[in-house]
């Protein structure tokens, strides 16, 4: 009886330890963001998912996000609850990865939990796109779970297909996570002595899982669009017809993007945003070099046959392509930090490959490689903990500064003769120009998606303005779109804020000119 219950107890302890590690790393890195309400950019526009946000999600193919919100939380973006849910999904993903590769040591759990929790994808999502954070991390869990099911047995790809459908419906880019994990599993099995034929058939089942999941997802998406009456986005950066550009591209363009897919994969991993770039770039380069040498050492060993050696090298060469697949299928036009979670799985390689080397037969100085590599991974994780906190602080400072400016703007609006709050239509022209483009010391942190401006709205459309007045200022202003009126000579003649006369009622509408349109 003890032999039956002991594995279950070991798995339970590993799960709880893994969750504890994720939440400790998560609180260090992201508690600032989860305990503040610095909504901006898309998270401001989609603060309340009941309506616009849910329509946006369906229109770009992420039709399961509204369902996810309905099940686990309200349609509103609740920072702390969203953060806790996101960390829970990351913790379960980390546990499945540990089991997938039979990593049982506490050190492995600490490191895997660390780089899955503290990375630029998680930080950029939580800083600017918090409304999507829990859904995106659930997409991660579904992508990892699909690979876990596929690896469990011959027919595991069938439940894996269901999980891939769920992952696609939450955020399509997490297919790259599945691809990289599948490649890693196949490589490790070949190094363990599995025959090429068996691994190829297993790989074909993985391809069937991904392809079948994609086809069923697409059919369901079309059904949801038809039933909801919501039109799919087309020919914009995050629309699902982006990959069709690949079919229209010339051979020269495809070759260029193919090369860029590999180049950017390594560039973005090595040159990832960091408070001490030289240190983290050196650490990443060292980890990649050690992993490469360890892989070649394993390939050259006598226990691996020649067909297996060749297949290992082919699969290893596919890892950068699979990890950066979004860049290739969108022809380099739509990939950003939120779409590259698969990059950070590269830190698994030293944890998988180094323990396989015959350390008892190697020289003593070489035996220090394992703890040194573990230390380098900790350095990279700690760097991302700092990056996350800087991003959240930047958003917080910008929110305070923007509130100060807009408080004064509202005073001007209310002082305009004939303006009745909540009744007079209001058109905001442009964006405030009183904020510095950068905060001193934060210049390098403008690079991630959604962090490039100090402007909270980022876009000056009526939707963002209406959200700011409703949710931040709690002001009853009746924000409308200006349309062609913004090119009216009377509007163009208005001076920009803070000049006197920057507000005026024209044809019954209050125009507030903040900058030239």
Model-derived regions: residue spans:
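Hydrophobic, aromatic-rich transmembrane alpha-helices
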Residues: 267-309
């Amino acid at each position: 009886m003890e032999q039956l219950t002991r594995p279950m107890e070991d798995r339970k302890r590993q799960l709880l330890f893994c969750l504890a590690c994720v939440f400790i790393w998560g609180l260090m890195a992201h508690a600032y963001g989860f305990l503040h309400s610095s909504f901006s950019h898309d998270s401001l526009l989609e603060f309340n998912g009941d309506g616009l946000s849910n329509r946006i999600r369906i229109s770009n193919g992420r039709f399961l996000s509204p369902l996810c919100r309905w099940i686990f939380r309200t349609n509103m973006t609740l920072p702390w609850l969203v953060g806790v849910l996101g960390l829970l999904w990351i913790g379960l993903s980390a546990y499945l990865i540990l089991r997938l590769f039979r990593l049982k040591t506490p050190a492995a759990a600490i490191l895997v939990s660390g780089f899955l929790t503290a990375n630029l994808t998680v930080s950029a999502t939580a800083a600017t796109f918090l409304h999507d954070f829990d859904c995106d991390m659930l997409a991660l869990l579904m992508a990892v779970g699909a690979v876990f099911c596929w690896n469990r047995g011959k027919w595991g790809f069938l439940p894996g297909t269901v999980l891939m459908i769920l992952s696609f419906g939450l955020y399509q880019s997490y297919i790259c996570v599945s691809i990289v994990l599948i490649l890693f599993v196949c490589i490790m099995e070949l190094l363990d002595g599995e025959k090429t034929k068996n691994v190829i058939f297993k790989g074909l089942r993985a391809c069937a899982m991904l392809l079948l999941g994609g086809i069923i997802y697409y059919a369901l998406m079309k059904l949801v669009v038809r039933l909801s009456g919501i039109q799919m986005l087309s020919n914009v950066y995050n629309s699902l017809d982006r990959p069709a550009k690949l079919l229209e591209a010339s051979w020269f363009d495809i070759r260029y993007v193919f090369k860029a897919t590999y180049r950017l994969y390594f560039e973005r991993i090595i040159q990832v945003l960091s408070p001490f770039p030289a240190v983290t770039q050196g650490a990443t380069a060292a980890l990649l070099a050690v992993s490469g040498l360890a892989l070649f050492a394993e390939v050259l060993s006598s226990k691996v046959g020649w067909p297996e050696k060749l297949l290992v090298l082919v699969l290893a060469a596919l890892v950068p392509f699979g990890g950066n697949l979004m860049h290739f299928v969108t022809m380099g036009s739509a990939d950003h930090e939120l779409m590259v979670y698969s990059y950070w799985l590269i830190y698994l390689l030293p944890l998988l490959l180094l323990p396989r080397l015959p350390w008892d037969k190697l020289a003593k100085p070489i035996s220090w490689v394992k703890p040194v590599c573990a230390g380098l991974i900790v350095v990279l994780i700690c760097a991302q903990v700092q990056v996350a906190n800087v991003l959240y602080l930047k958003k917080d400072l910008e929110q305070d500064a923007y509130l100060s400016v807009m408080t004064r703007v509202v005073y001007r609006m209310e002082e305009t003769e004939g303006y009745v709050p909540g009744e007079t239509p209001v058109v905001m022209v442009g964006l405030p120009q009183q904020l510095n483009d950068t905060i001193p010391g934060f210049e390098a942190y403008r690079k991630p998606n959604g962090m490039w401006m100090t402007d909270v709205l980022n876009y000056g459309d009526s939707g963002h303005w209406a959200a700011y007045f409703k949710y931040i200022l709690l002001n009853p202003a009746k924000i409308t779109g200006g349309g062609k009126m913004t090119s009216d000579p009377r509007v163009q003649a208005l001076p920009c804020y803070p000049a006197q006369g920057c507000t005026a009622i024209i044809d019954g509408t209050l125009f507030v000119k903040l900058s030239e349109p």
